[in-house]
């Protein structure tokens, strides 16, 4: 069996297990949908608009792609961090490495699984946004949307794998992953419009990749946004974080449980 077939089988196996895991379904699918409905219902009932890149846009067109970005981080970063750390602690990663399957196929399958989950989740959220809140993709933005989804997922996965070096136990991963994701959600223009943040907090948020992923996706759906949909600075920051995460992951990833030999 070729490595490519093994990669697809590994992703399929992971997807099947993920959909059977109640906690994973709640965490990566139901939770983002609840957030989407709550934010759009609460904020759309105020004045109905917020400021985005100097123009007024309706809340639904702002929050819907923001929640998509947040779900990418939930799945690619936090979800993968927790899954890998838990499987390592149980000794499953060590067993995988002892099989003839190349190591990169296992990790690649995990990333491919996350990409598929993100695409499914993005479609669900966008359909809900379109049907319930009249949110629509900008003309000619489909290609940019695909780039942001794939690049954003790859970046978050790379960072999630890299952080497994620090989260030596499943409990630590279950605390660190959601904590980082929630904090960045507040400072990256996901939960609170960027125009409502203090300048220093906005600047802090833009250091991290979630702000650029959220802004990129928001540009894809904002009818009043100007300029190119595929913004070079957002893509560059996401790519830089992805490369940094990949380098750290390659150099520091551990297959053995805490306390085992290297």
Show which residues each predicted segment covers.
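Alpha-helical transmembrane segments and their short interhelical loops
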Residues: 103-182, 227, 231-239, 243-247
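Hydrophobic alpha-helical transmembrane segments of multi-pass membrane transport/permease proteins
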Residues: 20-46, 60-79, 119-122, 180-185, ...
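Transmembrane helix boundary and interhelical loop/hinge segments in multi-pass membrane proteins
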Residues: 18, 76-101
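Short helix-capping/hinge motifs at transmembrane helix termini and TM-loop junctions
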Residues: 39-48, 129-137, 167-168, 192-197, ...
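Transmembrane helix segments
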Residues: 30, 37-47, 164-211
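Short hydrophobic, aromatic-rich alpha-helical segments embedded in or entering the lipid bilayer
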Residues: 2-12, 190-232
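Aromatic- and glycine-rich beta-strand/loop motifs that create alpha-glucan
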Residues: 1-31
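Junction motif at the cytosolic side of a transmembrane helix
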Residues: 221-225, 236-262
